[in-house]
Curated annotation (Swiss-Prot):
InterPro entries: Acylphosphatase, Acylphosphatase-like_dom, Acylphosphatase-like_dom_sf, Acylphosphatase_CS. This is Acylphosphatase. It comes from Aeromonas hydrophila subsp. hydrophila (strain ATCC 7966 / DSM 30187 / BCRC 13018 / CCUG 14551 / JCM 1027 / KCTC 2358 / NCIMB 9240 / NCTC 8049). Its EC number is 3.6.1.7. Transmembrane segments: none annotated. It is an enzyme of class 3 (hydrolase). Residues 5-90 form the Acylphosphatase-like domain. It catalyses: an acyl phosphate + H2O = a carboxylate + phosphate + H(+). The active site is at residues 20, 38.
Amino acid sequence: MGEQSFVVRVWGLVQGVGFRYFTRERALQLGLRGHAYNLEDGSVEILICGPEQSVQMMLGWLERGPRTAEVTRMEYEVAPPPKGSGFHTN
């Protein structure tokens, strides 16, 4: 299995509910790198990169989000891998 990298955008009740914090924790558990950033329109952008199986598990998790959130829409597309290591939030 190779590495995959996607940029994901989620909408709904995803800001002010710990979404980025829980996303970072889950990504680190899965050995992924990337970021989770709040956007001005109320959505969250997530860049995830890592082993294919871990990335696919993360995509499934992002569709639901943490219990504190309510994801109403999610879109993703292939993206260049992030420079550097770790998982960052703004």
